[in-house]
């Protein structure tokens, strides 16, 4: 499965722990969306990342190629049981993203990838620890400087 990560799953240490052996396909951008923090996590002590439609905005991230085992592990971490399950914290949806620096020239510029969408909203600013995990991943994957700067301006709960 192609998976578009834009939150803490950008962080290489977190992804290595959750999905050992995952494959990075490339840097990608989701157009006409913005990064938001629509769900509060007790594990992270604040809001966790999601995206909302927003004209003129973009969300940067990474596309990973995940095995079925990786997907099952990520589903557990993200609170996804099965499509439409009332106990899901998130649903998985598919979205078109643009690969800006694919690792392999044979990969199409636009790909359809899955991402996690919160089922309910309980917005909160992120914790400093959570935002730092995103920023560390964004730096590791060389997301654009202006996007890194925007991440650094996000207010935190602490």
Predicted segments with their positions:
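Glycine-aromatic micro-motifs
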Residues: 1-158
């Amino acid at each position: 499965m192609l998976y578009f990560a834009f939150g803490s799953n950008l962080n290489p240490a977190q992804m290595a722990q959750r999905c050992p052996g995952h494959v990075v396909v490339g840097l990608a951008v989701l157009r006409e969306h913005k990064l938001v923090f629509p769900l509060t996590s007790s594990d992270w002590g604040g809001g966790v990342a999601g995206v909302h439609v927003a004209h003129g905005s973009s969300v940067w991230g990474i596309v990973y190629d995940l095995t079925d085992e990786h997907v099952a592990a990520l589903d557990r971490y993200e609170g996804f049981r099965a499509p439409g399950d009332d106990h899901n914290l998130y649903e998985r949806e598919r979205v078109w993203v643009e690969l800006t620096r694919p690792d392999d020239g044979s990969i199409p510029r636009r790909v359809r990838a899955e991402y996690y969408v919160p089922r309910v909203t309980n917005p909160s600013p992120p914790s400093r620890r959570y935002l730092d995990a995103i920023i560390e991943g964004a730096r590791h994957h060389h997301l654009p400087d202006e996007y890194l700067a925007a991440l650094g301006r996000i207010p935190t709960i602490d």
